[in-house]
C-alpha cells in the first residue's frame, strides 16, 4: 500500500508515495501523474528518508542540569522538587515530562518579563515545519510573549525576493506554476545551480530545451545546466544587478519593450528610462573595459533580444538574493518582465526558486518581523535575525525560542553568533536531532518530522499540499510544544488538531487561503492547490492587474555601484580569491536529515573546495587547504582542481558544520533585508 504525502526537503515540494511496513519507510517514489514531480524524484527525495527511523532522533525533552543549578536558589519549590527526582545522563541532561518542562520555561519567562519586559523575548523559526506550526509560533511570540521579534530562515535566503518583487508588482511569490516551463519559448536562469538545488525543476528546464526552448544562464561558475544552454554567461562576482540593468538598457535602447503593456499596466516608465539610459554601468559596452569578460557585451544583448521577443520565464535562486543588492536585483528581474509583457500569461513570468519545503508558507503565516499573516503590517515591527543576534550580544534580548533553525551553523558570522548564544538566560530549541544549536540550548524538545504529522506545506510555486503521516511516533508536533508552553503561562490557545489551526488561518489570511479548506486539500492531495484559493485556485498571477494598490506595476531603477572583483579587474590588481558557497545535490542545508542516509552520506561526506586549474600553483604540494577571511577561517578542507570555476574564484558547499565555512562570513548583507552576502567573500588560501 502506498501513502501519499509531500517531500520534506527543498522548495520544489514534490509529491511522494511511500511504501511502509512495520512503521518503517521502505521506499519513496513519485506518482507518475504527480503535478510537481511528473513521476521523478531527486536522490534526496528517493533515499533521504532514513532520518525518520534513525536511532539518533531526539527524545521528547531534555534540560541541561547546569541550567537548573544556575537557578536552584530561585526555582519555586514545586518545580525544584519535581525535577530533582530525575537522573542526570552522561551528557549532563535530565529528561522530565513535557508538562514539567513547560512549567519550568513558563517560570523563566515570567521572571524575565518582570525584570526586563516583553521585548526581552525573540523567536527564530525554520521553514521545514508545517504552516500550522509557523502560524502558532508567530502568534505565540506576538500575543503570548507580547514581543514583535519573530523571524524565520527566509532571512538567509529569499527575503530579498519578497522585498524586491513586492516593490514592483505587489506580490513576492512565483507568478506561474512549474508546468509553465514546458510552455516557455525562452528561459533565463540566474544565480541558481538548479540541477543540484532544485533538481526536478532542472528536469523540466532540460525537457523544455529538448523541445525547442532557448536557455540562457548567468552565473559566476559553470553549472551542469550549461550543457543544455544556448547562452552560458559567466559573470564577475557581485554583478547580477548590473547585467539585469544592461538587459533593460538593451530592451529600451533597441525599442524591444512592449509599449502597449507598459502603457496599460505600469507606471514610472519615463523616469525609469531616463535613469537607465544615463547610467554608464547599465550600458553593456561597459564590459569592453573588464578584462576577461568582454564577450558579455554582445551576449547580454543577444539574450535581451530573445527574452523580449519570446514567451519567456526568469528563474532565480540564492545567487541573486545573497548579495548587498539582492532586493534590488529581484526588483530588476521584475522590471524586465513588466517591460516585455512577460508576465500574467502561460509560459511567461517569474519563478524564484525558494529554498526550503515550506519557506513560502512560513512567510505567508507571518513569521517575519515586518509582516503578520497575509502580509499585513504589524503595529510594531520587530527585529530581523541579525538584529536579534546583536541585541542578545548587547544584553537586550534574554530569551530565544528556536524552532528548527540551526543558526549556530547555517547563518553568517558564526564567531559572533556563538558568543551571543552563550549570553542568553534561556534558549529553547525544537529539533529532530542534536546539532550545533542544541549544544547551546537549555531546553531541547524532540518533535515530529514532516513524515510523521499532518500539515500544510507551500512550495515555491505557491502550491499547497496537505501532508499526512507516513509513520507514527509519540513525539509532539512543534505547535503542540508551543501551545504547551502557552498553557503553562495561563494562555490556552485552544487547538486540538492541526485542522483547528488551519481553520483559524483561513480567517486570519483570507486574501490567500479563505477557500483552501482541509477538505478541499484532502481531495487534491497529490496535485495540491495554488494560492490564492477562493472558489478555485489561481495558477497564474497578475493576469489582469498587479497586486498593488492601484493595480499597476511600479517601474523603479536602482543603479549598480562599482566594487569588488570588477574594480580589481579594471585596475588589473588581483588581491584575493573570491569565494561563493552553495548546496550539492546529496545534502540539504545543515545535513541533519540527509547525513542519516548512508547512500547520501557516501556521495558527499565532507565539503570540498573547487579551485580553478589555473590556480594550481597556490595549492601545489598540499593535501588540504584552509580558507581564511577577515572574519575567520575554515577547518582544513579537501579541494579539487576544475574547469568549473574561473581563475581567482572558488566554490565550496557548507553542509558539514565541522568545515566551519560560515565562520568566513561577516555582517555584510542585503541593504534592505539584511540577508547575508553568502555569495561573495574575499578569502586567501593557506
PLM features per residue range, with description:
Residues 26, 257-260, 313-314, 342-352, ...:
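Acidic/polar loop patches that form or flank catalytic/metal-binding clefts of enzymes
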Residues 81-94, 256-295, 470-539, 603, ...:
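N-terminal leader/propeptide and maturation segments of large enzyme subunits in energy/redox metabolism
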Residues 223-228, 276-284, 310-316, 370, ...:
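Short acidic (Asp/Glu) and glycine-rich catalytic loops that position anionic groups and cofactors
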Residues 1-256, 264-278, 296, 485, ...:
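N-terminal export/assembly segments and adjacent metallocofactor-ligating motifs
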Residues 135-206, 211-218, 242-245, 334-443, ...:
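Extended redox/cofactor-interaction regions of prokaryotic respiratory oxidoreductases
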Residues 473-524, 596-609, 614-686:
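Long, contiguous, secondary-structure-rich segments that constitute the structural scaffold
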Residues 247, 264-384, 534:
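Active-site phosphate/pyrophosphate-binding segments
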Residues 2-15, 416-417, 423-426, 430-435, ...:
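Phosphate/diphosphate-binding loops
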Amino acid at each position: 500500500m502506498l501513502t501519499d504525502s509531500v517531500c520534506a526537503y527543498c522548495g520544489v515540494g514534490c509529491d511522494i508515495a511511500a511504501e511502509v511496513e512495520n512503521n518503517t519507510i521502505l521506499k519513496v517514489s513519485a506518482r507518475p501523474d504527480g503535478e510537481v514531480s511528473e513521476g521523478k524524484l531527486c536522490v534526496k527525495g528517493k533515499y533521504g528518508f532514513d532520518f525518520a527511523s534513525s536511532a539518533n532522533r531526539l527524545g521528547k525533552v531534555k534540560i541541561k542540569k547546569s541550567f537548573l543549578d544556575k537557578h536552584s536558589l530561585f526555582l519555586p519549590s514545586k518545580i525544584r522538587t519535581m525535577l530533582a527526582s530525575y537522573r542526570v545522563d552522561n551528557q549532563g541532561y535530565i529528561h522530565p515530562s513535557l508538562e514539567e518542562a513547560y512549567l519550568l520555561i513558563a517560570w523563566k519567562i515570567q521572571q524575565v518579563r518582570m525584570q526586563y519586559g516583553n521585548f526581552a523575548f525573540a523567536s527564530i523559526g525554520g521553514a521545514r515545519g508545517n504552516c500550522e506550526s509557523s502560524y502558532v509560533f508567530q502568534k505565540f511570540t506576538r500575543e503570548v510573549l507580547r514581543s514583535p521579534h519573530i523571524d524565520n530562515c527566509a532571512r538567509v535566503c529569499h527575503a530579498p525576493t519578497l522585498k524586491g518583487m513586492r516593490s514592483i508588482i505587489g506580490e513576492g511569490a512565483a507568478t506561474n506554476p512549474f508546468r509553465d516551463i514546458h510552455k516557455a519559448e525562452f528561459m533565463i536562469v540566474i544565480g541558481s545551480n538548479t540541477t543540484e538545488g532544485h533538481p526536478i525543476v532542472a528536469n523540466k528546464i532540460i525537457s523544455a530545451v529538448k523541445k525547442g526552448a532557448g536557455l540562457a544562464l548567468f552565473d559566476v561558475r559553470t553549472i551542469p545546466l550549461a550543457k543544455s544552454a544556448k547562452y552560458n554567461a559567466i559573470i564577475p562576482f557581485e554583478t547580477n544587478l548590473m547585467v539585469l540593468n544592461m538587459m533593460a538598457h538593451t530592451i529600451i535602447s533597441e525599442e524591444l519593450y512592449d509599449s502597449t503593456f507598459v502603457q496599460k499596466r505600469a507606471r514610472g516608465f519615463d523616469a525609469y528610462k531616463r535613469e537607465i539610459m544615463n547610467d554608464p554601468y547599465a550600458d553593456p559596452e561597459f564590459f569592453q573595459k573588464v578584462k576577461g569578460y568582454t564577450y558579455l557585451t554582445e551576449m547580454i544583448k543577444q539574450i535581451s533580444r530573445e527574452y523580449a521577443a519570446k514567451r519567456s520565464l526568469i528563474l532565480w535562486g540564492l545567487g541573486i538574493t545573497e548579495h548587498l543588492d539582492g532586493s534590488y536585483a529581484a526588483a530588476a528581474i521584475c522590471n524586465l518582465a513588466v517591460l516585455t509583457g512577460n508576465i500574467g500569461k502561460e509560459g511567461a513570468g517569474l519563478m524564484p526558486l525558494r529554498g526550503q519545503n515550506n519557506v513560502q508558507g512560513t512567510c505567508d503565516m507571518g513569521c517575519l518581523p515586518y509582516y503578520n499573516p497575509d502580509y499585513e503590517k504589524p503595529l510594531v515591527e520587530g527585529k530581523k535575525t541579525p538584529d536579534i543576534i546583536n541585541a542578545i550580544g548587547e544584553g537586550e534580548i534574554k530569551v530565544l525560542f528556536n524552532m528548527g533553525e540551526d543558526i549556530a551553523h547555517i547563518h553568517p558570522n558564526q564567531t559572533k553568533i556563538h558568543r551571543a548564544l552563550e549570553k542568553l538566560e534561556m534558549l529553547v530549541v525544537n529539533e529532530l536531532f542534536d546539532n550545533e544549536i542544541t549544544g547551546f540550548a537549555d531546553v531541547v524538545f524532540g518533535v515530529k518530522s514532516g513524515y510523521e504529522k499532518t500539515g500544510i506545506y507551500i512550495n515555491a510555486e505557491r502550491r499547497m499540499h496537505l501532508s499526512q503521516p507516513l509513520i507514527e511516533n509519540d513525539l509532539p508536533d512543534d505547535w503542540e510544544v508551543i501551545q504547551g508552553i502557552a498553557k503553562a503561562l495561563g494562555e490556552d490557545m485552544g487547538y486540538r488538531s492541526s485542522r483547528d489551526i488551519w481553520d483559524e488561518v483561513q480567517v486570519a489570511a483570507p486574501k490567500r487561503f479563505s477557500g483552501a479548506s482541509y477538505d478541499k486539500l484532502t481531495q487534491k492531495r497529490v496535485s495540491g492547490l495554488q494560492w490564492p484559493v477562493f472558489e478555485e485556485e489561481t495558477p497564474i498571477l497578475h493576469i489582469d492587474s498587479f497586486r498593488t494598490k492601484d493595480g499597476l506595476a511600479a517601474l523603479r531603477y536602482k543603479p549598480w555601484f562599482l566594487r569588488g572583483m570588477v574594480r580589481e579587474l579594471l585596475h588589473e590588481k588581483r588581491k584575493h580569491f573570491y569565494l561563493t558557497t552553495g548546496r550539492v545535490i546529496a545534502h540539504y542545508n545543515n545535513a541533519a536529515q540527509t547525513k542519516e542516509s548512508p547512500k547520501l552520506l557516501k556521495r558527499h561526506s565532507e565539503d570540498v573546495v573547487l579551485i580553478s586549474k589555473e590556480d594550481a600553483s597556490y595549492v601545489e604540494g598540499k593535501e588540504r587547504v584552509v580558507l581564511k577571511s577577515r572574519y575567520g577561517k575554515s577547518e582544513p578542507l579537501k579541494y579539487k582542481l576544475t574547469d568549473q570555476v574561473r581563475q581567482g574564484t572558488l566554490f565550496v558547499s557548507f553542509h558539514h558544520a565541522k568545515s566551519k565555512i560560515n565562520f568566513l562570513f561577516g555582517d555584510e548583507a542585503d541593504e534592505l533585508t539584511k540577508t547575508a552576502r553568502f555569495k561573495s567573500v574575499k578569502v586567501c588560501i593557506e
